């Protein structure tokens, strides 16, 4: 069983990634699979600048990593987290595109629809940002809270 760290470790832009991971593991797409039965270890990296690699999964160690880079939004973190969970679920597939091939892309799209209710076409590319933008749009504009004058 993966270790639980202090709450602040998982907090990214107001989102507790550990709690979000637990919610995502209960999605119908993962039902009956290893991910529904066994919690992976979640690590959060916090570099000083945005890296080329914003997350990764190591299926053999049942571990994922999400990078909380400067300027990350909650939608970015959600996209990265679910992307890496889908890697654990799907694993390495045969063929030339064993990690990001058609099977992975179909599973990722289904997971995004189930998790966030997104009504977007499947993207042609697997590059980070497409689903994050849709999640942020679905969240809506941030509401300002103004004090009431007495």
Predicted regions and their residues:
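Active-site recognition of the HExxH zinc-binding catalytic motif
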Residues: 79-92
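Metalloprotease/metallohydrolase-associated module, dominated by Zn2+-dependent proteases
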Residues: 2-75, 92-150
């Amino acid at each position: 069983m993966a270790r639980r760290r202090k709450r602040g470790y998982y907090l990214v832009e107001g989102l507790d990634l550990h709690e979000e991971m637990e919610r995502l593991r209960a999605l119908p797409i993962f039902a009956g699979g290893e991910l529904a039965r066994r919690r992976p270890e979640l690590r959060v990296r916090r570099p000083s600048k945005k890296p080329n690699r914003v997350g990764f999964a190591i299926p053999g160690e049942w571990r994922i990593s999400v990078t909380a880079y400067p300027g990350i939004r909650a939608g970015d973190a959600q996209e990265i987290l679910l992307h890496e969970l889908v890697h654990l679920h799907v694993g390495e597939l045969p063929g030339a595109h064993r990690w990001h091939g058609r099977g992975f892309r179909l599973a990722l799209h289904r997971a995004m629809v189930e998790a966030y209710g997104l009504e977007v076409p499947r993207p042609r590319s697997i590059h980070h940002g497409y689903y994050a933008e849709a999640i942020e749009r679905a969240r809506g504009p941030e509401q300002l809270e103004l004090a009431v004058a007495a």
